[in-house]
Amino acid sequence: MKFIDEAKIEVAAGKGGNGATSFRREKFVPRGGPDGGDGGKGGSVWAEADENTNTLVEYRFVKRYQAKNGEKGHGSDRYGAGADDIVLKMPVGTLIRDLDTGETVADLTYHGQRVCLAKGGKGGLGNIHFKSSVNRAPKQSTPGEEGEARSLQLELKVLADVGLLGMPNAGKSTLITAVSAARPKIANYPFTTLHPNLGVVRIDENHSFVMADIPGLIEGAAEGAGLGHRFLKHLSRTGLLLHVVDLAPFDETVNPAEEALAIINELRKYDEELYGKPRWLVLNKLDMLDEEEAQTRTAAFLEAVGWDYPKPDDRFQFDMETPRLFQISALTHQGTQELVHQINQYLTEKKRIEAEKAEAEKAAANVEIIEQQPKTDTGVFKPE
């Protein structure tokens, strides 16, 4: 299936049914009172996050979604039937914006999340509601309300804990295959990966994380060159980036350091926030080099890119600040277990810190609410 991560659609809820104007007609009751029922509600349009839906391709072909109108009211105080709602299944990670206002309508972040995109109109009132002591035979009823209508922009940003970044053919797809059950297409030529691939990396029964592999970047990606620029947005929700570098390119004229610096430059030009995300360096394809050559190339590469970070100190607590360096072979799995182990440690510590921060903010908000409450004089003796 073709990977589609953007679409524009129109949604329109149904109109409420009109209320009925009707009077009782029974034998021996020549002047029966009003008995017009209310109209039914119009159908609404909902978006629902579905973990089994992976692309927005359906919304490229069907552009408009119109819910049905509610049924009009009937005599004998019978209400009109409400129209069925429409539920649009969308991938988890879909961001929905109103094209006219720019407002974010919904951010679908978990399976089963449901958001109303267009609310159906209320049914009109039948004339039974307008009976009074001065008007025993009202002919008044109200029409149903119009349903909401919107033009929407759908944008899919995959949800992953870790994102792989690098030039085409750096070995990102091989890495995600080595550490997860994902099976992306792998071949010895650039741009084998044409859309994001997700892989779940399982550490044990209780710990796992999601890794995203996007098409490789090339110089000029921020301006639209190559394929990767379309998918950089998918890295915006990740908590950690792995910059994968081919340390043993087949083309001897290729300079890994220059390519790595070009990637960093493209990242900065595309989005400062994305550039500022925690980023670890992964030197790949060590299986192509003997030990001495690997050490020589690694030292030359680190000097060329200005890597002068100390080795992280994890003796007392996992070091969250210092960028990390890994030397691996995704093909032979050399070094990959240590890599995923440290990623898991990082993500676990990150979640703990975020939970503590959220708890502290909640406590501070509660204190502020208490301080803002008006003080009363209850229980204070005030002699007259």
Swiss-Prot record:
GO terms for biological process: ribosome biogenesis. GO terms for cellular component: cytoplasm. Its EC number is 3.6.5.-. GTP binds at residues 166-173, 191-195, 213-216, 284-287, 329-331. Residues 160-348 form the OBG-type G domain. GO terms for molecular function: GTP binding; GTPase activity; magnesium ion binding. Residues 33-43 have a biased composition (Gly residues). Signal peptide: none annotated. InterPro entries: G_OBG, GTP-bd, GTP-bd_Obg/CgtA, GTP1-OBG_CS, GTP1_OBG_dom, GTP1_OBG_dom_sf, OBG_GTPase, P-loop_NTPase. It comes from the Bacteria. CDD domains: Obg. Its cofactor is Mg(2+). It is an enzyme of class 3 (hydrolase). Keywords: Cytoplasm, GTP-binding, Hydrolase, Magnesium, Metal-binding, Nucleotide-binding. Residues 20-46 are annotated as: Disordered. Residues 1-159 form the Obg domain. Mg(2+) binds at residues 173, 193. Belongs to the TRAFAC class OBG-HflX-like GTPase superfamily. OBG GTPase family. Monomer. An essential GTPase which binds GTP, GDP and possibly (p)ppGpp with moderate affinity, with high nucleotide exchange rates and a fairly low GTP hydrolysis rate. Plays a role in control of the cell cycle, stress response, ribosome biogenesis and in those bacteria that undergo differentiation, in morphogenesis control. This is GTPase Obg. It comes from Neisseria meningitidis serogroup B (strain ATCC BAA-335 / MC58).
